[in-house]
């Protein structure tokens, strides 16, 4: 970032923090005025001032602003690692999608207002006006005008909940630090909400079986030259742009072959591809695909993940392909299942099906397996470049899953914490009004009010800790 961008960022952070502590500042000023009133107004009720409550409210407000600033610091520090990160995560109609990396748009998205700030800005004038009205009713309305500042400070202090300034800053800073360690960065509330809204992730061949996990255990040729067979298979895999491309490319290089021109390429729902190479009809796919295409297979071949090549409806080669599960992928799939994030399988490899995933990974893995047309369209979405809601700086499924799952946890924690904070503010305002109206100052002591506000802040702190445990 240049100097102008840094100054703009500092100014925006100052505005956000200022809005967050404004109600606490007003509350502290009113309580300070009540301290003066106790000295100069002889008719004021002889009860302690609520100044400690106002001081602690300022502490919590500044703590929340500091945690938010720390979260943005970790996020932007990670985003500044590379001007062109390997991948970004954006939203689609079906769910989160990983695409080629791009930074522009990430910073402005990260600085958009979060839901806690929206509620805080909406609640601040309501609580302030309600406290003035209630203070007037409980003092001037009962001919106790000298108690106006006392009642106002009590009602406003109870309505200025300690929890609301922490609703966003605490979980966000915790998740931002966690994301930094995982090699990703999420663009604040807006980015987290966008990529986790659908509770789904589009996964391709490379996400489930990264390079090195698909191996060739052997090749059997039927009346053809191995170099020609490898050229045809590699050309078909490259045209399909599937996970087998790297495997057959290695075979092609070892056999000294070359890529052929592929015409009339088509995908088949049955698990294979067809094309025309040098005027020959070429098929590449699974054993079941070959049978449906009326290609005769020899007996005794029992390869659950074998790939078969046929030329002019005659079997030319059989490739024994082995899929080695990755521990990181298995961990990511378990994490997604625990958080109820649905994987959408956008595979082009005919072997990568829900049945294969259950054999290779834990049996509880559940994926959405759309039609062939949708799978191809979803996999092509990776070639687009949408708005960066999150940035990924490491390869593999795990950082991708961390970003989406963590974003969902973050949004849930912030929504729940905000709801509890608003409820606590409303409850505190009404209860304190009732007590001061009845003159029950012996129940509404500064210590009792502090305990009340701290108890409402405790669930928010627990939710912030919960957000980072997944």
Residue ranges and their predicted role:
Residues 154, 213-217, 229-235, 314-317, ...:
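Bateman (tandem CBS) regulatory domains
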Residues 6-200, 348, 391-470:
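Hydrophobic alpha-helical transmembrane segments
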Residues 99-121, 220-270:
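ATP-binding catalytic core of ATPases
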Residues 173-190, 249-256, 280-290:
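Short, positively charged
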Residues 8-14, 253-355:
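Signature of the cytosolic headpiece of P-type E1-E2 ATPases
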Residues 217-221, 323-325:
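A short acidic/small-residue loop/turn micro-motif
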Residues 93, 277-279, 311-446:
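Conserved ATP-binding TGD loop and adjacent catalytic N/P-domain core of P-type ATPases
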Residues 193-218:
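Asp-based phosphoryl-transfer active-site loop
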């Amino acid at each position: 970032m240049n100097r102008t961008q840094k100054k703009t960022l500092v100014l925006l952070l100052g505005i956000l923090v200022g809005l967050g502590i404004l109600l606490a500042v007003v509350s502290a000023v009113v309580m300070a005025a009540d301290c003066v009133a106790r000295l100069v107004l002889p008719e004021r009720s002889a009860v302690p001032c609520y100044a400690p409550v106002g001081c602690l409210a300022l502490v919590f407000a500044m703590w929340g602003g500091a945690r938010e600033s720390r979260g943005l610091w970790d996020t932007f520090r990670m985003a500044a690692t590379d001007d062109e990160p390997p991948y970004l995560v954006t939203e689609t109609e079906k769910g989160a999608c990983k695409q080629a990396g791009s930074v522009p748009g990430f910073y402005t998205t990260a600085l958009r207002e979060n839901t806690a700030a929206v509620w805080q800005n909406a609640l601040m004038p309501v609580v302030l006006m309600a406290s003035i009205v209630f203070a007037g009713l409980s003092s001037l309305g009962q001919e106790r005008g000298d108690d106006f500042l006392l009642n106002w400070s009590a009602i406003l202090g109870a309505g200025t909940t300690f929890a609301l300034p922490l609703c966003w800053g605490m979980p966000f800073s915790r998740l931002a630090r966690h994301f930094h360690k995982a090699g990703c960065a999420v663009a604040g509330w807006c980015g987290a909400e966008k990529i986790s809204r659908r509770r789904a992730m589009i996964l391709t061949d490379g996400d489930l079986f990264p390079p090195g996990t698909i191996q060739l255990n052997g090749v059997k040729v039927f009346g053809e030259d191995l170099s020609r067979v490898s050229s045809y298979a590699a050309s078909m895999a490259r045209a399909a742009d599937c996970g087998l491309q790297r495997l057959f490319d290695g075979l092609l290089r070892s056999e000294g072959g070359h890529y052929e021109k592929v015409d009339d390429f088509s995908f088949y729902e049955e698990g294979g591809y067809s094309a025309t190479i040098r005027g020959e009809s070429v098929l590449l796919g699974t054993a079941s695909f070959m049978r449906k295409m009326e290609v005769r297979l020899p007996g005794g071949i029992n390869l659950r993940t074998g790939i078969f090549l046929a030329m002019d409806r005659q079997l030319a080669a059989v490739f024994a392909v082995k899929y080695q599960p990755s521990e990181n992928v298995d961990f990511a799939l378990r994490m997604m299942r625990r958080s109820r994030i649905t994987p959408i399988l956008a595979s082009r490899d005919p072997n990568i099906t829900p049945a294969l995933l259950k054999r290779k990974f834990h049996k509880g893995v559940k994926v959405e397996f759309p039609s062939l047309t949708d799978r191809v369209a979803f996999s092509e979405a990776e070639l687009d470049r949408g708005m960066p809601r999150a940035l990924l700086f490491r390869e593999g499924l795990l950082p991708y899953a961390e970003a989406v799952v963590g974003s969902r946890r973050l949004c849930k924690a912030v929504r729940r914490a905000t709801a509890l904070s608003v409820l606590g503010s409303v409850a505190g305002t009404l209860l304190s009004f009732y007590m001061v109206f009845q003159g029950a100052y012996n129940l509404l002591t500064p210590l009792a009010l502090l305990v009340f506000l701290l108890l409402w802040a405790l669930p928010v702190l627990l939710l912030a800790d919960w957000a980072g445990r997944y």
